[in-house]
Amino acid sequence: MAVRSARARRLQTVLLLALIVIGTGLLLTRCPANRDGMPGQLAQAMTETTSAARSGASALDMWMAERSTAQLTSVQLSDARDEVINAYEGIAELRADDPADIARQQMLTESMTSIIGTLNAASAAVRGIASQPPADRVRNDLLAVAAELERGYR
């Protein structure tokens, strides 16, 4: 009986280790940066950028509908800008070898720069700086750039 229980414990240990290894492998393959290399990193940065642009547009929607304060909207716009900056930093120094990746990286960094500028203009509009375009135009610009980025990236 003792031999059988020792064998069962060993088998249990081996199965547990196998499950941990398989689980870790599955977790790593779900991450696009690990699964797809540079294309995955670029796709992730594109997703983060379009999400941030849409978050900024949503913050402006709430502010224009008077459902949010100028201070909260400014914080949300700053957070969206920071998300784009972090995504930019993640891909700006990547060294692409594939012409398609080089083109995507260039298009993505140009779009990110445009979105950062638009988010800055949105923040200025919320703060009431007269030389900035109206908030509804900035909101539409954010949504248009996000949609164009998604269309152009594919």
Question: What positions do the PLM features span?
Answer:
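Short, Lys/Arg-rich N-terminal segment immediately upstream of the first membrane anchor
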Residues: 1-9
